[in-house]
Amino acid sequence: MCGIVGAIAQRDVAEILLEGLRRLEYRGYDSAGLAVVDAEGHMTRLRRLGKVQMLAQAAEEHPLHGGTGIAHTRWATHGEPSEANAHPHVSEHIVVVHNGIIENHEPLREELKARGYTFVSETDTEVIAHLVNWELKQGGTLREAVLRAIPQLRGAYGTVIMDSRHPDTLLAARSGSPLVIGLGMGENFIASDQLALLPVTRRFIFLEEGDIAEITRRSVNIFDKTGAEVKRQDIESNLQYDAGDKGIYRHYMQKEIYEQPNAIKNTLTGRISHGQVDLSELGPNADELLSKVEHIQILACGTSYNSGMVSRYWFESLAGIPCDVEIASEFRYRKSAVRRNSLMITLSQSGETADTLAGLRLSKELGYLGSLAICNVPGSSLVRESDLALMTNAGTEIGVASTKAFTTQLTVLLMLVAKLSRLKGLDASIEHDIVHGLQALPSRIEQMLSQDKRIEALAEDFSDKHHALFLGRGDQYPIALEGALKLKEISYIHAEAYAAGELKHGPLALIDADMPVIVVAPNNELLEKLKSNIEEVRARGGQLYVFADQDAGFVSSDNMHIIEMPHVEEVIAPIFYTVPLQLLAYHVALIKGTDVDQPRNLAKSVTVE
């Protein structure tokens, strides 16, 4: 959600800002803008509703010169998508971009109106611009004005502030929304995501909660909320912006579906040795902590929540450890009882999901045994704030609908299950079967992808549908949830998932000839139960689409389409059966003509509540 890029240099920075915004497009947005100040203090601002390319075209028509600038992509929260609501916002010579939500913007707006300020947008961000302007009028430097203004804000914010009268300085403040400073040679940068700055630097400082930074071309000074100077370590990033172009693929989502065999190989690299899972990257003290674990609490949102749901079956059935999975936005606002020696596991592709981060911070107050983050972005807030972290190493994921981040999360979770089973002294065959399954997984998915054309043909049946039902049992139920989420995310078809045994408790009332029912049916101990559920749907005229193990004994009929899947090891079946559901959602969206990579109203990284 929302992207920030800022730069202060001797050279013109407009193209640096635009390239940074292009690299943040995957997060989702509805408008874009930038402001540049030259050495004489002349400020030029451009804003456009729509894509960054429209802003870039405007910049070509109105060349921007100046060595100090800030830019932003907006995902609407307060106020509709419009040019007037696009950032940067201005209060005389003060220019502001902001990610997050200012919860007390209404009373602040009334106070500022009473002081004579006029608001020209519906946004909460304009409050920051006027508030800093007011505080600056009371005296002191821009930094002092920001230090007085920031404590008046309630909510989450990552904000960068520029004064056109003093173009030698940028101010930034962080609370709940990430900001990272990029260090150059005689120039410095700031962004909401290090990906935006990789063309200009590899050295970064990640701002911590409550930090306020003063940035010039040759210096970066960081202060806490009291104004006391603090030191933050700079790091050399090896992160690769490896999305590149789409190559032979039509969309990033399609590309990322097909990248999954290699992504999983990357996840496994260096982590399997002599037939065992090797997670020594966790550090020398990790085994001591993990051996104490008597309960696991998983927090996540969206697709990551579904991967947590799958892993619950694994932790309990394979490692013998009770496990609960909760939506992070629910966990943080309820009173919960902490189980003895409970490990908090957080799942997030970006590592910046606001509710998941808040849940992690709450867990530290509640007295959990420790915390472990599973994430795709090194150096993200979730990774930095957790006791332990495991990277999925999926590579940059651009499509808003997560694919390879999901399957690599599951791969990491299954490795963790194997390690915990060994630490608990359980039968060595458990780890052996997991390792064997994971090593086979990339080739199994490659086999599955060869059926893409058949799934594409099936997708035609969904083009005029308004609803769909997904069914699964056991550890395939969360895969049904994920399949339904993918379909609704990118095709805008209302889709729901149920545990197949729940059909008679309500969903069966929805079944008719216009309701497609998608079933995942591996050949496991629940197959016969699942067949009974399928017959209940057939008897009521439902249109069935069954992704079934080739040995499961299904036969296609008028209202039952069987898509045979190669037999796979049972332990990896949930990961494997995810892929055909991803392809189905992709092809349905393609037929319907929706924006596959950036579906309406959605953002890649949800950094506000």
From Swiss-Prot:
Record keywords, A-Z: Aminotransferase, Cytoplasm, Glutamine amidotransferase, Repeat, Transferase
Q: Residues in domain SIS?
A: 286-426, 458-599
Which superkingdom? Answer: Bacteria
Q: Name one GO molecular function term.
A: carbohydrate derivative binding
Is the keyword Zinc assigned to this protein? no
Active site feature: 2, 604
Under the heading Gene3D superfamilies, the entry gives: Glucose-6-phosphate isomerase like protein, domain 1, Glutamine Phosphoribosylpyrophosphate, subunit 1, domain 1
Per the record, what are the reactions this protein catalyses?
A: D-fructose 6-phosphate + L-glutamine = D-glucosamine 6-phosphate + L-glutamate
Broad class of enzyme this protein falls into = transferase
| Location(s), subcellular | Cytoplasm
* One Pfam family recorded for the sequence: SIS
* Primary location group: cytoplasm
Q: Name one GO cellular component term.
A: cytosol
**Which InterPro entries is this protein grouped with?**
GATase_2_dom (IPR017932), GFAT (IPR005855), GFAT_N (IPR047084), GlmS/AgaS_SIS (IPR035466), GlmS/FrlB_SIS (IPR035490), Ntn_hydrolases_N (IPR029055), SIS_dom (IPR001347), SIS_dom_sf (IPR046348)
Q: What is its EC number?
A: 2.6.1.16
A single GO BP annotation from the record?
carbohydrate metabolic process
Start and end residues of each Glutamine amidotransferase type-2 domain: 2-218
Q: State the function annotated in the UniProt record.
A: Catalyzes the first step in hexosamine metabolism, converting fructose-6P into glucosamine-6P using glutamine as a nitrogen source.
Database matches in NCBIfam families: glmS (TIGR01135), PRK00331.1 (NF001484)
PANTHER family in the record, alphabetically?
Answer: GLUCOSAMINE--FRUCTOSE-6-PHOSPHATE AMINOTRANSFERASE, ISOMERIZING, GLUTAMINE--FRUCTOSE-6-PHOSPHATE TRANSAMINASE (ISOMERIZING)
Q: How does it assemble?
A: Homodimer.
Q: What is this protein called?
A: Glutamine--fructose-6-phosphate aminotransferase [isomerizing]
- What organism does this protein naturally occur in? Shigella flexneri
